[in-house]
Design a protein with these regions (language model features):
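Catalytic cores of carbohydrate-active enzymes across secretory and cytosolic contexts
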Residues: 1-297
Length: 297
């Protein structure tokens, strides 16, 4: 039986700690030691239990722990200092602004099948993802007007462990996107932003999630929604999972769907970078759009 209603019960953040939510939802903390220190200081045990996930940790702390932090002047000063650093980081001119002028809308788009940003958003397997994640972080530090585009995998990449007999086994932990530093992209009316792509004779819908990586937005497509068939839902099930057909379906969604997502969000980059061949269908979608826009035969 499907649930009629789902809801989450979380403690109420004291007003003086409300900035923790903003900090938790900007992945700048993942490469800033002072920001990391805020969460470790708030609850060392909670930080470790959450797998270094500040969003999950804030939802799991007891109310009295939050009240104690709110009454701790040393912690309050630490939080204020970090939030001031973040404010300056986000709004003061950096290298790109000093060399090339204002921000404008993103001029460069970075497409990748995986992004290794932090362990609490496990949608990467190794070097390719770490490279993509570091690319976004470096662009943020430099002030480069970049936007990232990828897929949001329900189970990510497999985890390895040894069973009692010493044999290597694999598991696919389920990702809870609502307890990760992610947010759904929404229209002005509050409805979810969605794109649609024709894949294998079926119209596949995907909603758009956003992760804020310092100054850089990263948009991730998620096909695991009730409107899709079970087969379509599985397209964003596992990173590099399934057979060759599944891989092609993922690449179609990334290339065609990623371009449509940016257009729907009002973004029109001048330069598109494809991290290896996984987003090769992006080139075909750009050609299709150019033919229609310029009425080419």
């Amino acid at each position: 039986m499907k649930p009629v209603l789902q809801y989450r019960v979380v403690p109420r953040l004291p007003e003086s700690l409300s900035a923790l939510q903003d900090l938790a939802h900007n992945l700048w903390w993942a490469w800033n030691h002072e920001a990391l220190g805020v969460f470790r200081r708030l609850s060392p045990e909670g930080w470790d239990r959450s797998g270094h996930n500040p969003v999950q940790m804030l939802g799991a702390l007891r109310q009295h722990e939050l009240e104690e932090a709110a009454a701790d002047e040393g912690f309050q000063n630490h939080l204020r200092r970090v939030m001031s650093d973040l404010e300056n980081y986000l709004h003061k001119p950096r290298w790109y602004q000093r060399e090339h002028g204002g921000d404008g809308q993103p001029l460069f788009a970075y497409f990748s099948a995986e992004f290794g940003l932090t362990e609490c958003v496990p949608i990467y397997s190794g070097g390719l993802g770490i490279l993509a994640g570091d690319h976004l972080k470096s662009a943020s530090d430099l002030g480069v007007p970049l936007v990232g585009l990828g897929l949001l995998y329900q189970e990510g990449y497999f985890r390895q462990y040894l069973n009692p007999d010493g044999w290597q086994q694999e598991s696919y932990p389920d990702n809870d996107f609502y307890n990760q530093p992610l947010a759904l992209a929404r229209e002005a009316a509050g409805n979810e932003q969605r794109i649609h792509v024709q894949i294998g004779g079926e119209t596949v819908a995907a909603r758009i999630w956003r992760a804020q990586v310092g100054r850089v937005p990263l948009y991730l497509l998620d096909a695991n929604i009730p409107d899709n068939s079970p087969a379509a839902q599985s397209i964003t099930g596992r990173l590099y999972g399934g057979d060759q057909e599944m891989r092609i379906q993922q690449e179609i969604l990334l290339g065609f769907g990623g371009y449509r997502a940016l257009r729907q969000l009002g973004l029109n980059p001048r330069v598109y970078h494809m991290n290896e061949g996984h987003s090769a269908f992006l080139a075909l979608e750009r050609i299709r759009h150019a033919r229609e826009a310029h009425q080419l035969g």
